[in-house]
């Protein structure tokens, strides 16, 4: 993984899956199905990625049975970490800096990495964005444009004869994936 092995002078990003940030405690191979069935057998290895990271944005599904991504006693290791965007907004969940939710009007707060308590903005600490309804936020203009596009570009072809666009956009029918989407079956097993 280049993100772990190279040094950069420009901004870069890394999008990782659970296979890259969780591992079995006993060293056996990772399996997503096993991970979801036996999360207690796994531990996080995301610290390898966060060590040189300036900004961490998480959007993973989490519930208390799953391991946390990192713990308060590890946060001092992340010398460059300045901002955490916790899209999941699980208070006291997988991200220990998410101690409360924020709002669109006031989207972030600062947290002291030693006490793990909220501090005044502008003080040394980590900025945390944890807007609990962020995944459902959609600007009015985008919503209107999306609705207009559905009305003009989709609905007529659902009601009348399809010119091929509906067929091309369909991933499954009658409980079966279309051939070009068969690879998705691996994600639901």
Model-derived regions, located:
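Short glycine/serine/threonine-rich phosphate/pyrophosphate-binding segments
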Residues: 1, 65-68, 93-94
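Glycine-rich phosphate/diphosphate-binding loop of Rossmann-like nucleotide-binding domains
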Residues: 1-52
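Structural motif
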Residues: 11-13, 54-56, 82-84, 125-129
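Glycine- and other small-residue-rich loops at beta-strand/loop junctions that grip anionic moieties
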Residues: 35, 59-61, 139
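Conserved active-site and cofactor/substrate-binding residues in soluble primary-metabolism enzymes
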Residues: 41, 51, 70-73, 141, ...
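Rossmann-fold NAD(P) dinucleotide-binding segment
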Residues: 45-58, 65-82
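Short glycine-/small-residue-rich Rossmann-like dinucleotide-binding loops
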Residues: 61-62, 88-89
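Adenosine-phosphate binding glycine-rich loop
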Residues: 83, 89-189
């Amino acid at each position: 993984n280049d993100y772990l092995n190279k040094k950069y002078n420009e901004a870069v990003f890394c999008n990782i899956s659970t296979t890259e940030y969780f591992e079995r405690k006993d060293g056996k191979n990772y399996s997503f199905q096993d991970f979801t069935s036996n999360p207690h057998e796994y531990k996080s290895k995301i610290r390898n990625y966060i060590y040189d990271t300036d900004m961490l944005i998480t959007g993973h599904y989490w519930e208390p049975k799953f391991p946390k991504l990192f713990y308060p006693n590890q946060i001092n290791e992340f010398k460059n970490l300045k901002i955490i965007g916790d899209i999941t907004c699980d208070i006291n969940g997988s991200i220990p800096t998410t101690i409360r939710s924020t709002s669109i009007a006031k989207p972030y707060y600062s947290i002291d990495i030693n006490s793990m308590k909220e501090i005044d903005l502008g003080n040394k600490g980590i900025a945390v964005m944890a807007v609990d309804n962020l995944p459902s936020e959609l600007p009015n203009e985008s919503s209107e444009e999306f609705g207009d596009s559905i009305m003009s570009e989709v609905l007529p072809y659902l009601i009348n004869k399809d010119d091929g666009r509906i067929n091309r956009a369909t991933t499954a029918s009658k409980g079966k994936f279309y051939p070009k989407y068969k690879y998705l079956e691996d994600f639901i097993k």
